[in-house]
């Protein structure tokens, strides 16, 4: 069964690897597919896809979009050809992704707000208006027992409107954190999402991030990326 890690970042946002390094890590991890989902930009997406094609790796172009304050939650869009504008409402972000023919995935839900995670009431209001195409139910962020129970309960109660169940590593460090969490799927990836033929599970990858690289990434995420947003660079 094909294996995907469908939530990956590069130096184009707050990741720590080039497109070439990301593709190399995915190939060495024996993945069949990745999704390139940099924050609020698709600057590296085409290069990742081209390098993936050359290496026999399927690449879904996408973006992890930051919605408007005060929520400032993250929404994943897959199968995109052009960037999604940041700082729109959650509903407008979802609509913009769907207008492109993209798929909407909810990443790392119900985590603390500093993860930019959607919260239960917000997600309920969203799916009351429009179902989403998938939701990450297995991820590397430390959910804790209480949040895990909350997510499991929410998914059980609302599964018809939440789409496919997804697992991903939210990879920022290439070979150091890719394929920790993966999605098994049948046949064509997009079709598998639409038909909910996916299985999230723990993958073969192991976390091995050097401490210096970790702190450099935190600076990129918490300082450099917000400054670029303020300057209008992304």
Could you describe each region identified by the protein language model?
Residues 60:
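General small-molecule cofactor/ligand-binding pocket signal
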Residues 36, 82-86:
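Catalytic cores of extracellular degradative/oxidative enzymes
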Residues 87-92:
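Ordered, amphipathic secondary-structure segments that act as subunit-interaction surfaces
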């Amino acid at each position: 069964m094909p294996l995907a890690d469908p939530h990956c970042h590069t130096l184009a946002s707050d990741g720590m690897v080039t497109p070439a390094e990301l593709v190399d890590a995915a190939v060495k991890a024996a993945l069949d597919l990745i999704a390139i989902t940099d924050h609020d930009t698709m600057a590296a997406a085409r290069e990742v896809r081209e390098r993936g094609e050359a290496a026999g790796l399927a690449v879904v172009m996408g973006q992890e979009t930051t919605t408007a304050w005060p929520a400032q939650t993250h929404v994943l869009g897959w199968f995109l050809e052009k960037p999604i504008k940041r700082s729109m409402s959650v509903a407008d972000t979802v609509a913009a992704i769907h207008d492109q023919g993209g798929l909407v995935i909810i990443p790392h839900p119900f985590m603390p707000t500093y993860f930019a995670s959607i919260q239960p009431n917000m997600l309920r209001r969203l799916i009351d208006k429009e179902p989403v195409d998938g939701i990450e139910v297995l991820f590397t962020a430390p959910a804790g027992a209480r949040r895990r129970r909350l997510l499991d309960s929410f998914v059980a109660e609302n599964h018809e409107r939440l789409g496919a169940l997804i697992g991903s590593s939210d990879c920022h460090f290439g070979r150091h954190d890719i394929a920790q969490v993966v999605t098994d799927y049948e046949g064509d990836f997009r079709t598998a999402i639409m038909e909910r033929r996916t299985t999230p599970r723990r993958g073969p990858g192991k976390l091995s991030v050097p401490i210096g690289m970790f702190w450099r990434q935190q600076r990129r995420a918490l300082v450099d990326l917000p400054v670029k947003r303020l300057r209008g660079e992304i």
